[in-house]
Amino acid sequence: MKKICYIILILCFSLVSCAPTENVIDDGTQANTTDLNDYENVLKSLDEEQIGKLPQNVKCIVNDKLSIDSEINIWDATSYYVKSGKVKAINFSENKDKCYDLMEKLAKAINLNKDVCVQSHRSENGNEIYLWDNNYTQDSIAIRNDSALAETHDGQLAVSASKFGTYYSPFNDKDKFRTDKQLMFMSAEEAEELAVKTAKELEINVCEKNELYVLDDKNTLIFPEYDTDKQNDTYVFFMFPDVYGIPYSRCPENEALTGYANQENHLVIAMDEKGISFLDIPPLYDWVETTETGEILHPSSILSKEVDKLKKYVTSGDIEVSEISLEYMLFADKNETYDIKPVWVVYYYQNQLVTGENSYTQKMALYDVYDAYTGEEYRIQ
């Protein structure tokens, strides 16, 4: 199934009040209170010499078109000195024994009977694909060279074939599923513990911070051919594989920029009242060598560049900067390896008016990418 990486959100947009707040940082202490109505003070708050003292969020209004209500995500990084280097993609289906071992772990995770005949065949590009498919229950496992997917029928409906639409819907408004609601069969905290435990059993290193989505009766099906009265209530966790405490890029990577096809770089683990119902493993990589260790720019420099750009080039449509995130981006080279470099990614929303017989406002989810060492912007085609 094709993964849709570019998300268009349809929401009514309103600017958020910019009253001063206090921010709690990773060690549990409180960062200095900042006058959040003052853009210059916001920049100063992001120019901390110690990366662990950065606030978790900043707010201000820049002008009548541009506001900031931004998370500051440094993930598990502990220093402004960050490595770059080369990595090689792990081939899940290259070694038959390792492939079967992974299949057994996935079968155990979603409680499938693995004592069946496993089919294998070659894809068009020559890579081996291993399939376990129960035609009666419609549960399945598929292991390809660059990814693996295990899903029960209920999990496939809840996560893939619904309005949540992890893969299908270009208008998937995932934010409405980011709630504090607790489902009856398990608390969100217990569900997260199970997700973290499962990632460890699969030997996948992920950042401590996860994204949780709660799917309930609002998560209706988007395909009429599926006939069911009720969707199972489901917790869905997006977990971010990392290297040196920094996740692989979470933005929809551009093939013209990176040299390889778009991929979503998050591990998806979903669970309903029966247990884990959906498990999607993204491409993973082995670190081959370190080519550079350098000091990255502070987020204040990146935010300043982004604000200057948005003020200069964007003349219509309200804009809200929502996140500044330190991530690793991969660039394909000629030797079946990838150059991996630290980047700052700025995520923002922009309102766009769609005119016609029934005009409406469309909220676009956009992003810009900057070299974390130099501040040079990578041009996204």
Regions found by a protein language model. Give the residues of each.
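Short, exposed beta-strand "edge-strand" segments with a Pro/Gly-rich flavor and a Y/T-containing core
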Residues: 65, 81-92, 287-304, 318, ...
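Segments that shape or occlude catalytic/ligand-binding pockets
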Residues: 178, 193-355
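Sec-dependent N-terminal signal peptides of Gram-positive bacterial secreted proteins and lipoproteins
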Residues: 1-24
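Intrinsic-disorder/low-complexity peptide segments enriched for small residues
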Residues: 7-9, 13, 110, 129, ...
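Preferential activation on post-signal-peptide N-terminal prodomains/segments
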Residues: 18-258
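Activation/maturation switch segments at domain boundaries
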Residues: 24-29, 328-381
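A short, surface-exposed beta-strand/turn
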Residues: 141-166, 248-281, 354-381
